[in-house]
C-alpha cells in the first residue's frame, strides 16, 4: 500500500494528538540507542570480593559517523559501555568526553552511515507537546508523551552541582530513560532527559539544546574529542537550516554543520571562521554533518586548500582554507 493511502487511513482512524506522537516517535526512533553498562564494585559480606553489576540507560545518534549523546551520570565510572542500535546491532562504545556539571557525555562507536536524530529549532513554549523515547527499566524503545510544564527550572541532582535552565515536563520518566531524547511533535530533539523527582509523579527534567551545544564545544576544546574535520581545526554538529533562509538564498539542502569549536591557531581560525557558522559546502560537495566534512578533508594533503561555503548572519559566504 502506498504511503499516501496509509496517511489517509491514519487521518481517519487517529486524532491529531495521536498522529503527532506517532509521527515523532517514528521519526526519532531509529536514532535512539540502548546503553548497557558494566561496573566493578565490591561484594557485600565477609569476603569483600570484587563483583560486576550492570545498568541501563538511553542515548541518541547525533552524527552518522557514530557520535552518540547521553547523560554523564549514565556512563560515569563504567568499566564497559555497550550500545545497541534500533536495528539490533551492538557495539562497544568509547567515552569521548563528558561535562558532569551539566550531565552531558559524548560517546563514539565504530560505525557510520547511521540514522541521525535531527535537532529542533526555535524556542520551546509552556504547554507544547513533547515526547520522550528511551529504555525505562530496560523496556526498550518506550515512548511517553506530555507537555512542557515549565522552563528555566533549577534542580539539585545527586552527585552534581545545581543544574539550571532545565525543561520541566509531565512526560513519564523512569530509571533507564536518562540520556534519551526529548523531542517535539515533529520528532526533532529539543532536550536530553536527565532526571525525575523521586516519589513524585509527572515531574521530569531535561537538558535544553543551548546547554547541550555549549557542553559539546567544551568537550571538543579539551581535545578529549576527535572532532570531524580535525585537519581544519573545527568541531561541530548537524543542524537544520532555516526554511526561509534556504528559500531566500536558493539553498537546496536541509542541513548543515554548525561549528561549535574553532581550534586557536588552526586552519579554520586563520581563515576567520567563527563559532556558530554553518558550513554547507566544501570543495563543491554538500556538507550536512561532521562526517561529510571529515570525508572531504581527508582526501586532501597538508598545504592544499579547501573552499568552504557557510552561513553567517543570514548571509552565504565563501572562504578558502589552507590545510
Question: For the regions a protein language model found, what residue spans apply to each?
Answer:
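A structural signal for short, well-ordered beta-strand elements
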Residues: 74, 205, 261, 280, ...
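PDZ-domain C-terminal substructure recognizer with occasional recognition of PDZ-binding tails
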Residues: 108, 217-224, 270-274, 280-323
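Serine-dependent protease modules
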Residues: 2-248, 253-255, 298
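Residue-level recognition of short loop/turn positions
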Residues: 65, 87, 186, 265-267, ...
